[in-house]
Amino acid sequence: MKYKDLRDFIAMLEQQGKLKRIAHPVSPHLEMTEIADRVLRAEGPALLFENPVKPDGTRYGYPVLANLFGTPERVAMGMGADSVSKLREIGQTLAYLKEPEPPKGIKDAFSKLPLLKDIWSMAPNVVKNAPCQEIVWEGENVDLYKLPIQHCWPEDVAPLVTWGLTVTRGPHKKRQNLGIYRQQLIGKNKLIMRWLSHRGGALDYQEFRKLNPDTPYPVAVVLGCDPATILGAVTPVPDTLSEYQFAGLLRGSRTELVKCIGNDLQVPARAEIVLEGVIHPNETALEGPYGDHTGYYNEQDHFPVFTVERITMRENPIYHSTYTGKPPDEPAVLGVALNEVFVPLLQKQFPEITDFYLPPEGCSYRMAVVSMKKQYAGHAKRVMMGCWSFLRQFMYTKFIIVVDDDVNVRDWKEVIWAVTTRMDPVRDTVLVENTPIDYLDFASPVSGLGGKMGLDATNKWPGETDREWGRVIKKDPAVTAKIDGIWEELGL
């Protein structure tokens, strides 16, 4: 099923018993996090808090949607897939678009035409009138404190916008960039835009600032998009394709956009809330600390200040929010689902890879386990280096374990068995110093710069060892079949 907006998706989830309305008054200050965390860990439904309340007990005017993508199944549904396993088909499409192959013949060429036609017909449709601009706050009427912005953890410094899709455009780019960056509330019209220097929005801003050092930089932040657009913003879309175009492909219909009232950026026409504004030259503020997806409070640092000049919204808008914390949290669940999208992308570049897994306990990207069909000595090390360098999503992966294709990468018992029986700690450990590392990783010696470790837990080939290698014990299939046949009679 395809969803034209967030409300469509909510209605479908509610119809299937996958969304729970909460009429009881609940505060965005800590209470929503407590409830959402319990529900997510129980693999429970999405939550619509209908009566969020302020500290003094008065009611906010808008409901809060939380735990929307709290299970991999709901992520798949949001991407238009029938199941999590079907997400690999989306990955295969992205792999083809990233590096299209010449057709192998007339039949192959014709088989690819429908896909190419679908993709290029998904250019966004720009409309003049949009639901997201039914209500407009401008000037003194702009007041972010009227929104039920979530305060997630006890030592968080302030409420935090967590599910905002930030829309930017670089001075030399035709298409816009969509990114999700947390934003600290510091005033009725002020947010801190915490984008790291390598992220798309930050790069657009840096390029603009070089050419226009004294000019305010236009930005829009979208809250409450349709699921295809939200998930398109966190998917490794090829540079030749816009996130809006990819969202249209997932949805099966063109993304409807509308121009912002105060700038030329285009935003989803059926979004719930849109913040329009600018980043003024040299205006920064100290951000944090905040509890993050690592399970720790992160360091403070200075980031640009986003001045909100206008808030537009639908009638009776829904505020979409989440929290981040020690896994599992909603980003970790997203990582589990998107893992299936990554596999075909890696296999396109490295056909020897049979599976790839980012354990959610590893903060969704800091550790990877890869299985492969090994073909020569040193092959596992090539795969390690390839994974670190091929997709920018894995630039911050600290640990990569490589195993043979007889090991299930999603079963820690098998992975640990391979590590402890097929590895020599000295020979089979790869250490790389002074590599890009997650800014939030306080374990690294220098902020943004640290080490990586690769563990080669594959069977060793001649040239890698001088010893006779062990043979894996395997059961006799005939005996196994015989015992299967009499198992019930044994009464065990």
From Swiss-Prot:
Q: Per its record, what are the GO molecular function terms?
A: 3-octaprenyl-4-hydroxybenzoate carboxy-lyase activity; metal ion binding
Question: What are its E.C. numbers?
Answer: 4.1.1.98
The record's cofactor note says: Binds 1 prenylated FMN per subunit.
Principal localization?
A: membrane
Q: Which pathway features in its UniProt record? A: Cofactor biosynthesis; ubiquinone biosynthesis
Q: Which domain of life is it from?
A: Bacteria
Q: How does it sit in the membrane?
A: Peripheral membrane protein
Q: Where in the cell is it found?
A: Cell membrane
Identify which residues the record assigns to the active site: 292 (proton donor)
Q: Which UniProt keywords apply?
A: Cell membrane, Decarboxylase, Flavoprotein, FMN, Lyase, Manganese, Membrane, Metal-binding, Ubiquinone biosynthesis
Pfam families per the record? UbiD, UbiD_C, UbiD_N
* Stretches of the chain forming a coiled coil according to its record: none
User: In its keyword annotation, does this UniProt entry include Manganese?
Assistant: yes
UniProt cofactor(s): prenylated FMN; Mn(2+)
Read off the HAMAP family from this record: UbiD
- Summary of subunit composition and partner proteins: Homohexamer.
Purpose = Catalyzes the decarboxylation of 3-octaprenyl-4-hydroxy benzoate to 2-octaprenylphenol, an intermediate step in ubiquinone biosynthesis.
> What's the protein here called?
3-octaprenyl-4-hydroxybenzoate carboxy-lyase
